[in-house]
């Protein structure tokens, strides 16, 4: 895995957006794997800027999001579809029909999961998958213990994940307890992976991912099995790394 340490969150967003924009420029029909949560917001802001100021063209691209809460309609303000519209889709020229987010309120959730896997496969697979990392090392909503063979499925959210996401809801009781999530196998099927982490609260998970063994107990560590992973962290998220000193030259 390639490690890039940047000064702060602002630099992280710029660096990540640059990598994604390079993919769009080199392959206009790129298939993007996208993430939600707090960390990618800066990257999306920079991508919008690149689209507006440098005419980065998303018109032939397509996207697949990692996950969606079970039970939330696409119109719910805390759905990940609503997040994507607000933070990216409404501001770039990516056609609506080219964007894919799991349907959290589907009548048949198992069929929705199977159809999502089929759609990714029929698109030719994901070219570049953007990930965040949870405090417990989760990627997507693949919580500790997730199988390396897992594909898109309905998952139970852990207490720690529910607590971490409660800040987006009026109360913790409103946070869904299940989600549809791409599996570890689905994520590892992407041609490239870019994982972003910011802040001291992510430092332990980043250390375990990069310096620990590849284990289902830390789902992000399973990325060690992937041939093309770039990890971009700010100095706070890198604060527990013993290898950090060797990567000082990677700062931008």
Regions flagged by a language model, labelled:
Residues 33-37, 65, 102-103, 130-133, ...:
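Short beta-strand segments
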Residues 140-184:
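Class I SAM-dependent methyltransferase SAM-binding "motif I" and its flanking Rossmann-like core
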Residues 1-32:
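N-terminal glycine-/serine-/threonine-rich phosphate-binding loop
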Residues 124-150:
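Glycine-rich phosphate-binding loop
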Residues 185, 189-252:
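ATP/nucleoside-binding phosphotransfer catalytic cores, i.e., glycine-rich phosphate-binding loops
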Residues 46-57, 80, 144-153, 212-214:
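A glycine- and small-aliphatic-rich helix-loop capping segment at beta-alpha/alpha-beta transitions
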Residues 26-52:
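Glycine-rich N-terminal segment of FAD-binding domains in flavoprotein oxidoreductases
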Residues 56-128, 251-252:
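Ligand-binding beta-strand-loop-alpha-helix segment within the catalytic cores
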